[in-house]
Amino acid sequence: MAKPLATAAASSFPPAEILEILTQVTTLLKSRKETISIAETACGGLLSSSLLSQPGASGIYAGGLTLYTLPSRVAYAGWTQETIANYRGPTTDIVSGLAKHVRRDLASTYTLAESGTAGPTGGNTPNRKPGYVALAVDCERGTFVRELNTELGGDRTANMVRFAVEGLTLLRDVINGEAKL
């Protein structure tokens, strides 16, 4: 017979760094009766699972896709072989396209999309260095983008958490009307 999980282990998710901004976002979405969908790559499901860990998630979460591989983007995000041939790593154009596609398909109020280089390895261009992330939130008002480097180097898990925090922060700013197109 399997042992039950310890209470401390069960309560350590979502990561503490995410919890404050996550609570702000879910409270806003619930109060406005709006919905969110997610298209994530480098976060690997962290955004969706964090949102789903919150009470009342079924009222705000329209769905999500973890589009980590290029073939998954062809299958689920409308990418073509031409898109793949021209792919040069994560950019704001890439995440804008993902956000628009997923919002259209899932009919959510907002879609948050992210794509980045979590590490530990990467490439030589700025958008392929560990810590780089491109973010987009698509909604009726337009597509809001942000890009940054976490400066966390090749710490894969720390980058994934920071990407999630930054994505949720952009989402909060868009919901509150504080983000600029």
Language-model-detected regions and their locations in the chain:
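Short alpha-helical segments enriched in small residues
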Residues: A2-L181
